[in-house]
Regions:
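Conserved hydrophobic core element of enzyme catalytic domains
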Residues: 277-382
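Residue-level signal for inorganic ion chemistry
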Residues: 143, 200, 240, 304, ...
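A short glycine-rich, hydrophobically flanked beta-strand micro-motif that places a catalytic Asp/Glu
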Residues: 73-76, 148, 180-183, 316-324
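An anion-binding catalytic pocket shared by soluble metabolic enzymes
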Residues: 28-48, 157-237, 270, 330-354
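Short Lys/Arg-enriched alpha/beta "domain-start" segment
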Residues: 1-57, 154-161, 165
Length: 382
C-alpha cells in the first residue's frame, strides 16, 4: 500500500458546496478548464487545479509528457485518441508544486432536492446492444478474442450543473475508497467519475497497479460473495495480462492475494501488484502500455480494441480512458474512468457502463450487469 498524503498536505481552506457550485459554473461560463478530485481514503479533502487560479488545457501525447521536465498537472486520456478526443493536460498558468486542497462541506440536501427529479434509466434492452452482443459472441466463438467488453451509454434529459456538483459531493461520502473526480475542459465538457479501478499509483519509490474485474451487487452485511466462474475467469484475464506486461517491460513485481472490494452498490474482485520502476522509466510509459486493460477492453488487448471500435454503435469518448494527477518527480495517481457521467452542452446527461463478454455469456445477464453499473452512478444524482 502507498501511504496517504500527510495531514499537512491535506490541510486546505474550507469550501462550502454552494461555493463549489458557484466556482464550477463561473469557470464553465468562461470555458476555463479545471479539475477537482479526491483520492481513495482521503474523506472530503479535495485536490483542485484551475478553480482558485487560472489553468490551461492542451492536447498532449505520452511522448510529449516523457520529454517534458518538472511536470505537475491533471491528465485525462480517452479510450482511444482521436482528433475529437485527444489526451488532455491541465496545468496552472502560474506553476506551483502540487494541487491546492479544499476541505469540502456537505451540500444542502434540501437545495438539491428543489431541482426536478432526474429521469430514470431506460430499462428496456436496446436493439443496438443486442446486435453488438451477438457480433461479439461470434468473434469469441471464432477464436478472435477471449473476452470483449461491451459498453453502453444512457442519455437522460434536463439536469442542472449544480446537480452534477452535488453528485460529486455525495460521491465523496458514498464512495470512500474510490477516486472521485470532476473535470472540465472546453474540448471534453464536464465529466464526473467515481471509479474503484486504479491504473497506476506511485511516489517515486513505491508503485502499484491493480487487476480489478468481475462485478456483482453488494451483498448484505456478513454474507460472503459467491463469485461465479465467469467473474473469476474475467479477473484471471486481467491478472495474466498485467503480469505478462510487467515481465515484458522488465519491471520487478509481486502480486498480492485476490480479494473482494466494495465500492458503493457494487463488489469486484481485485489483486494488487507492487512494482519497482527501473531508473529512467517514465510512469506514463507504463500507463500507456497498460491501457486499455482487459477489464475495460478485452483480451488480446489490441485485437479487442480493434473489434470494439469496429462493432460498438457509439463512441466511448473519455469513458474507459484514464485520468488523474501526474507529477512523476513526486507522485502519480492515475485511475480508469469508469462509473462516470458526462454533462452535455444542452444540459442533458450521458451515463456510461460496460461489461465483459466471454463465450457462454448470457445476453440478459450482461444487460442486467450494465443496469446495475448505471444505477450505481445514477444513484448519486436522483
Amino acid at each position: 500500500m502507498l501511504s496517504k498524503r500527510s495531514d499537512k498536505e491535506l490541510s486546505g481552506r474550507s469550501c462550502s458546496c454552494d461555493e463549489l457550485i458557484t466556482l464550477v459554473a463561473e469557470r464553465m461560463n468562461r470555458c476555463a478548464p479545471f479539475a477537482c478530485f479526491r483520492l481513495p481514503g482521503e474523506g472530503c479533502a479535495v485536490h483542485e487545479i484551475g478553480l482558485q487560479h487560472e489553468a490551461r488545457a492542451v492536447a498532449t501525447t505520452a511522448r510529449e509528457l516523457r520529454e517534458r521536465e518538472h511536470l505537475a498537472g491533471f491528465l485525462m486520456a480517452p479510450f482511444v485518441v482521436t482528433a475529437e478526443t485527444p489526451m488532455l493536460w491541465i496545468e496552472e498558468e502560474q506553476k506551483e508544486q502540487g494541487a491546492s486542497v479544499l476541505e469540502l462541506a456537505t451540500c444542502d440536501e434540501a437545495e438539491l432536492e428543489s431541482f426536478p427529479p432526474v429521469a430514470p434509466i431506460p430499462q428496456a434492452l436496446p436493439d443496438s446492444y443486442r446486435v453488438t452482443f451477438a457480433r461479439f459472441i461470434e468473434h469469441l466463438e471464432e477464436g478472435m478474442a477471449e473476452k470483449l467488453v461491451l459498453a453502453h451509454r444512457a442519455e437522460l434529459p434536463s439536469i442542472a450543473t449544480a446537480q452534477v456538483v452535488g453528485a460529486f459531493d455525495k460521491a465523496l461520502t458514498h464512495y470512500p475508497n474510490a477516486f472521485v473526480s470532476l473535470c472540465y475542459t472546453p474540448q471534453s465538457g464536464l465529466w464526473l467519475c467515481a471509479t474503484p479501478e486504479m491504473l497506476l499509483r506511485g511516489d517515486g519509490m513505491r508503485w502499484q497497479t491493480v487487476a480489478l474485474a468481475g462485478t456483482m451487487p453488494r451483498q448484505r452485511d456478513g454474507e460472503p460473495p459467491l463469485w461465479s466462474e465467469k467473474n473469476r475467469r474475467e479477473h484471471r484475464y486481467v491478472q495474466r495480462f498485467i503480469g505478462e506486461l510487467l515481465e515484458q517491460e522488465g519491471i520487478p513485481y509481486r502480486t498480492l492475494a485476490v480479494e473482494t472490494t466494495t465500492t458503493g452498490l457494487l463488489q469486484h474482485l481485485q489483486a494488487r501488484f507492487a512494482l519497482q520502476l527501473p531508473e529512467g522509466y517514465a510512469p506514463i510509459t507504463l500507463a500507456e502500455r497498460l491501457h486499455p486493460t482487459p477489464a475495460i477492453c478485452g483480451t488480446p488487448q489490441r485485437v479487442a480494441q480493434r473489434l470494439i471500435l469496429e462493432e460498438e454503435s457509439a463512441e466511448r469518448s473519455y469513458y474507459a480512458g484514464f485520468l488523474g494527477w501526474y507529477e512523476p518527480e513526486r507522485c502519480v495517481d492515475l485511475f480508469v474512468q469508469i462509473r462516470c457521467l458526462q454533462l452535455l452542452p444542452e444540459q442533458s446527461l450521458r451515463l456510461y457502463a460496460g461489461g465483459g463478454i466471454v463465450r457462454g455469456s448470457s445476453l440478459e445477464s450482461e444487460w442486467q450487469e450494465v443496469l446495475h453499473k448505471l444505477s450505481a452512478i445514477h444513484s448519486l444524482i436522483r
